[in-house]
Amino acid sequence: MDKMADVLGRVGAWCGQNKYLSAIKNSFQTFMPLTIAGAIGVLWCNVLVNADSGLGMFWKPIMALEVINPAFAAMQFATISCITVGITFGIAQEIGEANGETGYFAGLLGLACWLAVTQSGWANYALVDTAKQTLELTADGALQTFTGVAGGALGATGLFTGMIVGVVSVEIFCALRKVEGLKLKMPETVPPGVARAFEVLIPAVITLAIIALIGRGCELATGLYLNDVISTYIQGPLGAIGSTIPGVIIIYIIIGLFWLVGIHGNNMLSAVKEALFTPLMLENIETFSKTNDAKSDELHIFAMAWLQMFGEFGGSGVTIGLVISILVFSKREDNRTIAGISLVPGLFNINETVTFGIPMVLNPILGIPFVLAPIATLAVGYILTVIGFCPKAVINTPWTTPPILHGFLTTGANIMGAVSQAIAIVVSILVYVPFLIAYERYQNKQAAEAAE
């Protein structure tokens, strides 16, 4: 156990000090309030004020509010559908700060570099025959081209490109900033803000040119924009690897092992989870906003909110199952006291009280279900989703949303989502109970030996 703790401790220290992982984690955490705001927009348009599949089917008066649906749809577009803009800026800014840059120029440069490699024009066609799906160029057959960023690149599809370009561009810029010959020195009479603008001018121009040339080279070599290449050959395969039950299980085993040596496992793997599962969640939200069907085959199962729904209720290790087990089955007053204190925080998915109060750290008995319980609940959730009993995750909810309510909201206000999460809670209790009994026997034995 000590050897494992030492190895995981070194890995955890490396993860915590790695500026790239920290930049990804911090950027997604900073953007989270906007993601939730966008999810509220989806909830309003698709679940509440919707006459086809929402509350409007059963309570017609609410449809009087339909006139403001476009405003809530705009909330979704400005946040979820444009997440790459915010994440690219955030990651570039974080990398700049890690390299000693002040102000927000690094973020602006990263965003400009991403725009330089993103499709910015398309042909306008008119649909002539809907039945045959034939297309004809508008304006008497003349090609009409419009400038502007391709909408698909703004959302989940462009996320990996934005992350990569945000990191690479600012690293190039910071390296060039160290070259004294590239700094334009201005007279002391020039205001500091203007002087700094000229100081970074040449490194910024070179950086932007390098990234733009890479994008153009990619287009000439492959016939595809850089975003399409990254989305197809990097983001797609990584998502495919992560969005499998073995991949998810491995991630949650590692999270549990980190916790058992006193390291916040979710923080350590936050960047990995965000990169793999947030794009899938965003695609689910987009699809649901168009189909209103939370069981559509187009939706991904392993989206971020789904993982939180089945693998993190009550906190890491799904410890709400342990808290309930103690309150129902424990015969030791000390454990019951800790569980009583931990119940309310646990209902909001905050579990440090029970994790460090029992404690779970370096606990060879309760450490086993701490790792196994999330695997069991994820497996059950996967089965329930595959057979169509549980809808898929289509709405982002705050991570502090209580279990069962979380399942209800995440699945588009579907009662079967709440029922499915309740089943997962029962499964977590069943996993913890036998180990709790064994642990209390061990505690009693230790107490008896100490009394002799």
Feature locations, PLM:
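Alpha-helical transmembrane segments in multi-pass membrane proteins
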Residues: 37, 80, 84, 88, ...
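Cytosolic juxtamembrane amphipathic/interface segments immediately preceding
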Residues: 5-28, 65-69, 186-196, 353-355
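Transmembrane alpha-helical segments and their short flanking loops
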Residues: 1-15, 50, 54-66, 138, ...
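Membrane-interface segments at loop-to-transmembrane junctions
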Residues: 186-198, 233-238, 357-359, 364-365
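Membrane-embedded translocation segments of transport machinery
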Residues: 215-216, 220-330
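Early transmembrane hairpin of solute transport permeases
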Residues: 17-183, 361
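Interfacial/capping segments of alpha-helical transmembrane domains
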Residues: 39-64, 123-136, 218-237, 264-280, ...
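Hydrophobic alpha-helical transmembrane segments
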Residues: 70-87, 154-161, 241-261, 296-317, ...
